[in-house]
A protein has these predicted regions:
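N-terminal anchoring/stem segment of glycosyltransferases
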Residues: 1-66, 116-117, 157-158, 182, ...
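A residue-level signal for conserved active-site and pocket-lining positions in enzyme catalytic cores
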Residues: 28, 57, 74, 111, ...
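A structural signal for short, well-ordered beta-strand segments and their strand-loop junctions
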Residues: 36-38, 69-72, 93, 161-166
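A short glycine/serine-rich beta->alpha loop
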Residues: 41-45, 94-100, 136
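Short glycine-biased active-site loop of nucleotidyltransferases that positions the nucleotide triphosphate
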Residues: 49, 84-85, 177-180
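GT-A fold catalytic core of metal-dependent nucleotide-sugar glycosyltransferases
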Residues: 51-106, 110-116, 120
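Catalytic core and acceptor-binding pocket of nucleotide-sugar-dependent glycosyltransferases
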Residues: 119-210
């Protein structure tokens, strides 16, 4: 078994992500990166599909019993995966230098999840927070899985050792700061949600040809 984490991801069937994920799959094949990337039915909305992320990760933790590296389906490997010091922690995530209550404080597009009980408990709390946010009848804002994770990391009791993931593992294409800071990325994130969110959320528009 490789000492590197197993790359895991999912994409939604019968959506544009079926084509988008092919770039991720091809990049994994090109660099011989071990991966398990699965197609799943859409839950009917972009936010519900995203909220499935921690549940999928828990499933993979149970099945694989090894460290995992989650990458969003619209990601692409630009160079080979390397063994990082952060892979000894329970959990690693990209953290921005902004206030802890900012919804974009962390970026969940790439995540390292170790095969530890502390990491498993953290992901469970994340899944629970996603569901609580989705079920909040008074909410007026869209639910982001990364905001649910932020809440868990900074406001919930957990025992996981959480460390920052290097920007090279989660460079956001088009982000001014990332473009300036990261010139040699391992993984780029293409933010396909900007193109496909409306497509997924409004099937009636597709039926009408809008």
């Amino acid at each position: 078994m490789s000492s590197l984490p197993l790359v895991v991801s999912f994409y939604t069937l019968d959506t544009p992500y079926e084509e988008e994920v092919k770039y991720l799959q091809a990049s994994c094949e090109s660099f011989q990166i071990e991966n398990q990337i699965e197609g799943i039915p859409s839950a009917g909305s972009w936010e519900r599909n995203c909220a499935f992320k921690p549940i999928f990760i828990l499933k993979k933790m149970e099945e694989c019993q090894r460290p995992l590296l989650w990458v969003d389906a619209d990601a692409v490997f630009i160079r080979p995966l390397e063994n990082l010091s952060v892979f000894s922690a329970d959990f690693a995530v990209r953290i921005y230098p902004c206030p802890e209550d900012h919804p974009s404080k962390i970026v969940s597009a790439t995540l390292f999840i170790n095969n530890t009980e502390a990491a498993r408990n953290l992901v469970y709390l994340w899944a629970k927070e996603c569901l609580l946010m989705l079920e909040d009848k008074e909410r007026v804002q869209e639910v982001w899985d990364q905001d649910a994770l932020r809440r868990v990391l900074f406001t919930k009791a957990h025992k996981a050792q959480v460390v920052p993931l290097p920007v090279e593992y989660s460079k956001i294409v088009g982000h001014p700061g990332d473009e300036e800071e990261c010139l040699d990325p391992v993984i780029i994130q293409n933010q396909a949600s900007r193109r496909y969110k409306r497509w997924i959320n409004h099937p009636e528009e597709r039926l009408l040809g809008w």
